[in-house]
């Protein structure tokens, strides 16, 4: 018969080395130790919020008194206040970030005006307008007061002083009498007028200008005794026609005036 001999087991040896089971359990619990989440009741939250409304940093005596009142530990109360302050700071930061953010979309909706490259800058436009206004004022001061039939804003094509002066001298030579001073134009005062009309009188119609010219012609002919005084429209002040016997007296006056002009 065969007998199997089994060696005796080693006594006093641990299966995992020399570490005991108690030491292993204590180390495992230390590594895995976690704080439990505290669930606050409605009464506890109301008491905590009331103290937080008074002060965000309660001292240790206030925390201990509050902990005894709501049946919590002082450590739990301190952690709650830390979390509550962090939440309050986050809320304040979010509110401050939303205020400038509300104005940014308005800036995006209204883009800045686009200026044409060929157009002059705003400063040059203002300067040019000011210069044009000063030139117009200086022109009005240079021209001075004008007669009723010599408006300074007539175009150059309608206001030809040389032609008008020749027509008046021709009428005077036909009749042999001098014209009144109001009908004699001043070529020197109107010769420098521009060939364009004023900005304010561009709406004047050609018919109105023709009517004024016709009235003026009638007034001139009336002063020269070529037409009877039956004009319906009022004309410039003119002298009465001298009698037939006084024509001989007026001719020396004309000869004297022509002699003075020739000198």
UniProtKB/Swiss-Prot annotation:
Keywords: Developmental protein, DNA-binding, Homeobox, Nucleus, Transcription, Transcription regulation. Residues 220-235 have a biased composition (Polar residues). Expressed in the dorsal horn of the spinal cord and dorsal root ganglia. Isoform 1 is higher expressed than isoform 2 both in the dorsal root ganglia and in the spinal cord. Isoform 2 is exclusively localized in neurons primarily involved in the processing of the pain somatosensory modality. The keyword DNA repair does not apply. Residues 89-106, 251-263 have a biased composition (Basic and acidic residues). It is found in: Nucleus. Its main location: nucleus. Residues 88-146, 220-263 are annotated as: Disordered. Residues 110-123 have a biased composition (Pro residues). A motif (OAR) lies at residues 204-217. GO terms for biological process: axon guidance; axonogenesis; detection of chemical stimulus; detection of temperature stimulus; dorsal spinal cord development; nervous system development; neuron differentiation; neuron migration. One of its GO terms (molecular function) is DNA-binding transcription factor activity. Residues 33-92 bind DNA. SUPFAM superfamilies: Homeodomain-like. One of its GO terms (cellular component) is nucleus. The keyword Nucleus applies. CDD domains: homeodomain. PANTHER family: DORSAL ROOT GANGLIA HOMEOBOX PROTEIN, HOMEOBOX PROTEIN ARISTALESS. Transcription factor required for the formation of correct projections from nociceptive sensory neurons to the dorsal horn of the spinal cord and normal perception of pain. Belongs to the paired homeobox family. This is Dorsal root ganglia homeobox protein.
